[in-house]
């Protein structure tokens, strides 16, 4: 006789095993209509799942986040059924829900294209309208393998073979169609609703291995209602408008070419943006008590073997051999082992700790060409990397100090808020469980003492220690994980780093790995999209354009440009024999924040007409006042404080 405890604390008792549907109906017809699934003792399950023992139950309705994930998962199943009904013989593989949508991978001799989407979506809507119920069945393993093999579904059969022997083989039916799936699912296909859309196709290797067959991945998005779908599509349009690759072309910031895949050719304007950010970060680190260093890019494999990176990271490293010397070198994928070498060079005392060591370190990591994306995902990049060598008792103070610095930097760059995630031990890791217990405990205590609130991101720590991940939200609601702080007891042990303590004995330092931007390249991509290329004056690649209205004003335009340049501004002149409206349009497209318009009258009066990006009004000022005001506005925020 199960007793069901509801979220309000009330208890309902039943004479025998009950399903979630039965419990909802006992509460009222409104809940029975609204409930899509349920949590039983915290586990999300189908409404049809039987409850035989006492349990706490919470019903999931359409407004819950869990419902949205289930809508997306079920839409993937509807997609798979639609594809197989339209193209018999197509093999299905996997189809999970993902952020903002879902995908399903298919194996077919002829790949799908976006031209197939209208037919697929029409068939999907028919399946939704039919409202086939989702029904869970548990099959014997051998029977399930035979069934899928007989249907020519070799990928599904392989998945079943690889499941642990203890795991039940759950099959979900929706009408005549079925799929291998753990669930849970909604009540029926009608619960998916109509707020879905297929978005794109891509290639994907089976199980992510290039030695396996190439599959066609169809991506889609699904939402609770049409309003949410329309809002998402609008965000995508806005993301397209802000795409750093397009803006980079329009502003002449950088380019990428086949001869250097994954590496960036920075143009003069782009490099001005890069160095403005780097100079700002250098000042921030100097104020924060960091010492800047520089370490080699090519390092012998012996160091990577000692650090553990050779075993864990070799497939992502670029390797070079020196035949005459019988050496194997690697371009460094990260800076930390090299920083330990500087720490080890000479005798260190506890009086030197905490020792904060920073480097704008050039790193190289292999990424498959299909994973590269503009300047946001590349093979060669520069990190704002730093390592703090400290004692265990100093971790909390250094954590608090770093978080304050990070918050100030993000605010200066236009990001007012961020979230913190605590990433604990991954499955593949270095060090003993005892060491990880110690590191995780130290970081948790540091967060408590520093007043840092966080959410858990289980299993996502670095292979040598737990970490805090700092997540920015941009102007259109996207999250970007940029900053990190990692506690590492492993690398100092592996690389034999030590200091002489107050007791005159040798001790291991704790190593805090930290970054604020992550990589300059990726962060600049985020920054371009955050501002849609409309940078604050201090970051703008070209801060001011002086545009002449008539040819007679050209000498004065040059004089204005020289005055502004002497005031420290980055200035270009436009004295072409073109109409002023055409000049304004061109420089507005290039997102120049300030255009100074000068003609005969301005030349006679010693004035300039100031036009701001995106504005139609002009403000007339004397040249001296304009130079003073713009120079003050162009100061980086840290130099104004």
UniProtKB/Swiss-Prot annotation:
Residues 1-61 form the TGS domain. It is an enzyme of class 6 (ligase). One of its GO terms (biological process) is threonyl-tRNA aminoacylation. Residues 243-536 are annotated as: Catalytic. PROSITE patterns: AA_TRNA_LIGASE_II, TGS. Binds 1 zinc ion per subunit. Catalyzes the attachment of threonine to tRNA(Thr) in a two-step reaction: L-threonine is first activated by ATP to form Thr-AMP and then transferred to the acceptor end of tRNA(Thr). Also edits incorrectly charged L-seryl-tRNA(Thr). HAMAP family: Thr_tRNA_synth. This is Threonine--tRNA ligase. It comes from Gluconacetobacter diazotrophicus (strain ATCC 49037 / DSM 5601 / CCUG 37298 / CIP 103539 / LMG 7603 / PAl5).
């Amino acid at each position: 006789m199960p007793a069901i405890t509801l979220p309000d604390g009330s208890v309902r008792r039943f004479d025998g095993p009950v399903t979630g549907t039965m419990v909802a109906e006992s509460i009222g017809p409104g809940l029975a209509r609204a409930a899509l699934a349920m949590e039983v003792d915290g586990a999300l399950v189908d409404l049809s799942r039987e409850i035989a023992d006492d349990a706490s139950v919470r019903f999931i309705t359409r407004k819950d986040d869990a419902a949205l994930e289930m809508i997306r998962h079920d839409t993937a199943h509807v997609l798979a059924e639609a594809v197989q009904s339209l193209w018999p013989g197509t093999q299905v593989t996997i189809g999970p829900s993902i952020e903002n949508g879902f995908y399903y991978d298919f194996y077919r001799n002829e790949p799908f294209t976006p031209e197939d989407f209208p037919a697929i979506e029409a068939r999907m809507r028919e399946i939704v309208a039919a409202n086939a119920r989702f029904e869970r069945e548990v099959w014997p393993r051998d029977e399930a393998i035979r069934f899928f093999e007989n249907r020519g579904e070799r990928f599904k059969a392989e998945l079943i073979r690889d499941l642990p022997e203890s795991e039940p083989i759950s099959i979900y039916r929706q009408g005549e169609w079925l799929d291998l799936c753990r669930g849970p699912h909604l009540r029926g296909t009608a619960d998916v609703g109509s707020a879905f859309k297929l978005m794109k196709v891509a290639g994907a290797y089976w199980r992510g291995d290039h030695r396996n067959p190439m599959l066609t991945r169809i991506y889609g998005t699904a939402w609770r209602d049409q309003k949410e779908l329309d809002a998402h599509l609008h965000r995508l349009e806005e993301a397209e408008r802000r795409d750093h690759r397009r803006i980079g072309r329009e502003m002449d910031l950088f380019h990428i070419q086949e001869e250097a895949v994954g590496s960036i050719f920075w143009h003069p304007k782009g490099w001005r943006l890069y160095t403005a950010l780097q100079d700002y970060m250098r000042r921030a680190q100097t104020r924060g008590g960091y010492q800047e260093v520089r370490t080699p890019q090519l390092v012998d494999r012996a160091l990577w073997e000692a650090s553990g990176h050779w075993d864990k990271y070799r497939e992502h490293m670029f390797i070079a051999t020196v035949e005459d010397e019988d050496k194997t070198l690697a371009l460094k994928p990260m800076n930390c082992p090299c920083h330990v070498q500087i720490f080890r060079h000479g005798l260190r005392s506890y009086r030197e700790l905490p020792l904060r060591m920073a480097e704008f370190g050039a790193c190289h990591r292999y990424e498959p060409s299909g994973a590269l994306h503009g300047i946001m995902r590349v093979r060669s990049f520069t990190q704002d990397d730093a390592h703090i060598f400290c004692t265990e008792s100093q971790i909390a103070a250094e954590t608090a100090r770093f978080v304050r610095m990070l918050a100030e930097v993000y605010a200066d760059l236009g990001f007012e808020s961020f979230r913190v995630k605590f990433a604990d031990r991954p499955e593949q890791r270095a060090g003993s469980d005892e060491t990880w217990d110690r590191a995780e405990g130290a970081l948790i205590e540091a967060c408590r003492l520093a007043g840092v609130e966080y959410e858990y991101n289980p299993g996502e720590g670095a292979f040598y220690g737990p970490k805090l991940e700092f997540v920015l939200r941009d102007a259109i609601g996207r999250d970007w994980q940029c900053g990190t702080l990692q506690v590492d007891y492993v690398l100092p042990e592996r690389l034999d780093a030590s200091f002489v303590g107050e007791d005159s004995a040798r001790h291991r330092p704790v190593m805090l790995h930290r970054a604020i931007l992550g990589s300059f390249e990726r962060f600049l991509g985020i920054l371009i999209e955050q501002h849609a290329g409309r940078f604050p004056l201090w970051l703008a690649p070209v801060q001011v354009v002086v545009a002449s209205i008539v040819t007679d004003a050209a000498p004065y335009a040059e004089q204005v440009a020289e005055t502004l340049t002497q005031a420290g501004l980055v200035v270009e002149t436009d004295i072409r024999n073109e109409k002023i409206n055409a000049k304004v349009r061109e420089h507005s497209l290039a997102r120049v924040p300030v255009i100074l318009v000068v003609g005969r009258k301005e030349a006679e009066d010693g004035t300039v007409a100031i036009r701001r990006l995106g504005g139609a009004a002009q403000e007339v000022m004397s040249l001296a006042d304009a130079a003073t005001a713009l120079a003050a506005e162009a100061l980086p925020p840290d130099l104004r404080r």
